[in-house]
């Protein structure tokens, strides 16, 4: 939208998991008066259509994985065009000494589990002072286990489904491998197949070994 407001035409490669949402947003913009050809949406496999988009654009804005970001940067550099990249991360939240632990837990819930944790800005690590750790864990566990997990169109639930089978297997794999290395499950750590094929319980791991990939690699 900012690109359109600045007077640019936009070609957008829609994520295959949210393609209808992107298309609807574009159609509503046209309905509101945006000229038909100013905002174009491209659908398809990124490996097939990605180069066609990046090799013909005047500027590239990419959100995705770090390996793909390197490819985009290389192709943009060869053409001497500008680009911006929002790539993988492992966002931490630090609870400071003297913090209000109830408030900190509330912030952690929204930051970690908004959109079922499927946001680039979601936190994936929590650092808590040793003297407050036990109390904070108890508060966090209580709050998480009171969350309503499910799916409805009435916004009656606090957390919903993951987007795909591939995503739930990725999440489960990270958790299972961490537990195998010695991490402890404070809460969650399991699929909720009774709710649907892609539901996974909101999960917190403690005592995660420094060697565990869940501590260093982005889960989403």
Over which residues does each language-model region extend?
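ALDH superfamily catalytic-core signature
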Residues: 33, 57-59, 67-213, 218
């Amino acid at each position: 939208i900012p690109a359109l407001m600045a007077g640019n035409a936009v070609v957008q490669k829609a994520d295959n998991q949210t393609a209808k949402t992107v298309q609807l947003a574009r159609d509503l913009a046209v309905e509101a008066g945006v000229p038909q050809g100013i905002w174009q949406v491209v659908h398809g496999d990124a490996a097939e259509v990605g180069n066609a988009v990046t090799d013909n654009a005047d500027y590239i804005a990419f959100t995705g994985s770090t390996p793909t970001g390197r490819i985009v940067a290389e192709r943009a550099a060869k053409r001497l065009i500008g680009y911006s990249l929002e790539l993988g991360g492992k966002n931490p939240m630090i609870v400071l000494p003297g913090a209000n632990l109830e408030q900190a837990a509330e912030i952690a819930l929204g930051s970690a589990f908004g959109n079922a944790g499927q946001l680039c800005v979601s936190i994936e690590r929590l650092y808590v002072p040793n003297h407050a750790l036990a109390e904070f864990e108890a508060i966090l566990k209580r709050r998480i286990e009171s969350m309503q997990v499910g799916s409805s169109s009435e916004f009656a639930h606090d957390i919903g489904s993951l987007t795909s089978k591939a995503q739930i297997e990725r999440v489960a794999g990270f958790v299972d491998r961490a537990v195998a290395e010695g991490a402890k499950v404070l809460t969650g750590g399991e699929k909720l197949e009774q709710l649907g094929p892609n539901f996974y319980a909101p999960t917190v791991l403690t005592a995660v070994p420094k060697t565990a990939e869940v501590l260093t690699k982005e889960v989403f």
